Each structure stands twice: as C-alpha cells, then as structure tokens.
Amino acid sequence: MIKNDTIAAIATPPGEGSIAIVRVSGPEAIQITDKIFSGPVPSFASHTAHLGTASHHGRQIDQVLLLIMRAPRSFTGEDVVELQCHGGYFSCSQILEALVSEGARPALPGEFSQRAFLNGKIDLIQAEAIQNLIAADNLDAFHIAQNHFQGHFSQRVQKISSLIIESLAFIEVLADFPEEEQPDMEVPEKRLNEALVIIEDLISSFDEGQRLAQGTSIVLAGHPNAGKSSLLNALTNRNRAIVTDIPGTTRDILEESWTLQGKRIRLIDSAGQRETDNPVEQEGIERAISAMKQAEGILWVMDATQPPPPLPEILFQKPSLLLWNKSDLASPPRIDTSLPQLAISAKTGDGILELKQFIQKWIQKQQLGKNSKVFLVSARHHTILQQIRTYLLSAKEGLLSQLPPELVALELRQALQTTGNLSGSEINETILGEIFSRFCIGK
C-alpha cells in the first residue's frame, strides 16, 4: 500500500437513504476536495462543518455538507474530509468519480482503519473490533466488539507485556551482570504469575464469548406430538418446521436463529422422547438428548390433553421451563415440582407473550454483569494467548529449576514478541532501559 497518497471511498452502504457519505483521507485530502467544493476548503478550521455544492467541470453534482478534520486529530491521523450528500447511488458515486479524477485513489477495503492503525490511532485489536461492530447481528456480539474497541482488551494485553518486560529485566541482570548483587528472584516469579492469571482469565472467556456472539441455545424437547415444532414456528413467526398429527414427525435437529429484544437465540427443535424400534427415529432421539446436554436452557413441551409424563433428570440440571401446550383444548394439570410451569397454545398464541417475557428474563439473569467483562471471540486471539501461556509457563519452570538465565530470558522474549502479535505493535528492545530504571548498575 502507498502510505503517502490520498484515498477516497463511499462510507455508507449502497441503496436508498436520506444521506450518503464520501470520505477522503491523506496529505492531499483538503486540496483535492477544494477542487470540487464551492467554498475555500484550505481556509476551513479543523472540526468544522460547511454547507456548499459539489461540482466538477462546471457541472453541479449535489448540495453537500463538508466536514473537515485536520491531522492528527482525525480517525486515520491524516487530513480527513467527509462530504455528506443526498442518499442513493448517483450523487455519491459522481462525487467519488470527481475526487478520483482530481488525484485521489479509490480506497481498498478497510484501508481507512488500516491507516488509523499504521498511524497509531488504534491498535490491531481495535481495528479488528471495528469489523466486528459492523458485523454484529445481536446485542451481545455488539457489546463484546464495543468493549474491544474501547480498549479494554488492549489494556489487558499491555498489562501482560509490562509484567513480562519487568520479569525479563530482572533476568537480564543475572545474565549480563553476574558479578553484581543479584535481585530477589521472587519478583520475576510473582510478575509471571500475575501475567498468567490475566491470560488464563482471557483464555477461559473464549467459549463464553463464542456463545454470547453466536446466541443462547435453547432446546425444545418433550414427548412426541406435544407441539414442539408448532411452538418453534409460533416463536419465530415462520413455518420453519413440518407440523403433522403423526407422532415422530421430527427426527433430526432443526435449528432456527431468533432475535428477542436484541438478544440472539438459537432455538433447537428436537425429536420427541419415547421408546421406539425405528432406528432412524432412535438416532433422532439420541441427538435430542445430546442437544439438551449441550444447551443452556430447555423448554420441555407437554400436551395439556394428556396425563403428566415423567420428567427427565436433565431438566433439574440446567435452566428449564415446563410448557403445557394445547391449553386451548384442555386445562393443563399441575406437576408437583420446583420447575416453573406455563400454559400456552402454539395454535392460538395464548401464553406466547408470557413465554417470550420469561425467556428474556431468563437470558438477562444468565448474563447479569457480563457486558463489562472482556470476552474473547477471535480464534486468532485465543491461539496467540495460548502460545504466550506456553512460553511463560516454560519460563516459570526454568526459574524454579534454576536454569541458566539466558534460557529463561529466551522464553520471555518469545512471549513478549508473541504478545506484540495481538496488538500489532513492533517489539522494541526496552529491556536495558528497564534495568537502568530499576537498578543502580554501576554501584
């Protein structure tokens, strides 16, 4: 990529809309924009807005609002100009064509964020978070990406780096100045333990982060012909599952994504639980049992017109709700159990609103206090942190085994370099500065 040229691109999605935005960034952003704007752009103060017209070769394109942000006080760290025009395809595309003809280059995908990273406005973790913010399809995924973009994950990585550097400084004293008074070796071990605690906390958050981003899994289970598939269709407002009066119609796992008040839920319809000699149906039943074990919640659907069936033990091992379906045909019986119960009718919609409210409170309770926690969702981050952990554990073992300090320092340097892969920073030699700041070497 040419780092000193000026780029331009349409920043809003294509299609009809009230406003479209064309963004320009680079050393010539102001001069190039001045060639198509009606006002004196070079004289505009930073962070000001100006109403005017965009024209090219004597032809007016559109009335626009120009926003100017001078370097380094911009997203990319360069001079940035944004032109807000009427929405739709033609206005913004003609403005972009005019800018390109006057010297701007069409930006590559993600190039504005890449320049922000290269100019030190954001680190690599934050750059990745921008894409996750845009792609988020539920509130949990959005909150996780927002947390990363705000720098909370980066702060953890910086803390890990600082602890590694501090440990390495002590080890370098042993290697480079063996004749001097040796420092307390409990200090580097303590720093490594602190770093490992942070790393373990981040690594352990990966599965939970994946679950939050992908959605809470809830299984619809119960005996055959109780109305599980009808309930799936009623909740999602789609005819997704085949519904018949024949028991055992559902023989495989059917998953449907559903959004409830911004929360993504993976509804899983499963085969009815009963004794059967049919090998295909039996396979479906076993898959249903496996799905219940892996799910975060179970909706156990029962037929209100039938006697209460026995409840499987798994319902008492995770959040579960007993649903008496077909309440429009009969008054549901009550089971003497600690599990909550609700009467519904998937056919008429009775009780569906109450069920949605119950599920919403269910999820809110499970996720209480999690919005402020740092979760991993990237396999790249997860893999790198595992590598760092391996290096630090090896270094710690070397300390305890009193291996030569050069070998311990090698593991720590590997860990430090790998940590830089998270933030995208270049690893500089700062160990000598750390040593001089902590010890009077010549004394």
From Swiss-Prot:
K(+) binds at residues 225, 244, 246, 249. Mg(2+) binds at residues 229, 250. Binds 1 potassium ion per subunit. One of its GO terms (cellular component) is cytosol. It is found in: Cytoplasm. InterPro entries: G_TrmE, GTP-bd, GTP-bd_TrmE_N, GTPase_MnmE, MnmE_dom2, MnmE_helical, P-loop_NTPase, Small_GTP-bd. (6S)-5-formyl-5,6,7,8-tetrahydrofolate binds at residues 23, 82, 121, 443. The keyword Nucleotide-binding applies. Its cofactor is K(+). Exhibits a very high intrinsic GTPase hydrolysis rate. Involved in the addition of a carboxymethylaminomethyl (cmnm) group at the wobble position (U34) of certain tRNAs, forming tRNA-cmnm(5)s(2)U34. PANTHER family: TRNA MODIFICATION GTPASE GTPBP3, TRNA MODIFICATION GTPASE GTPBP3, MITOCHONDRIAL. Belongs to the TRAFAC class TrmE-Era-EngA-EngB-Septin-like GTPase superfamily. TrmE GTPase family. This is tRNA modification GTPase MnmE. It comes from Chlamydia felis (strain Fe/C-56) (Chlamydophila felis).
